[in-house]
């Protein structure tokens, strides 16, 4: 099964706040060691998805690390992006929702804006196996 974790301030971000840096890095390292698949955050008023990254912001050699989603698109005033950090793969400046499906061995996502358009979507394998 997939391991999903949620907290408020993202470790990585293209936004004004530029992520939480050193404050969350030790927790990210722990989650990575425990096989976390997804980290959901808000705080920034936009949608952003990253490649799987280690606590230092690098893609792991084996591709196995948590993938962060920043989803602060629930209705507050949106604000723009700064220069996207390394490995930011999708950015949407529209109100909307993130739909996740956690299934045996994989997860999928769709970011749907308020007009009903799918603005980002994908599928990935889970890191952990559960009996």
Where are these regions (language model features)?
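Long, structured stretches of catalytic cores involved in phosphate-ester chemistry, encompassing
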Residues: 1-119
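Acidic, His/Gly-rich catalytic cores of divalent-metal-dependent hydrolytic chemistry
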Residues: 115-130
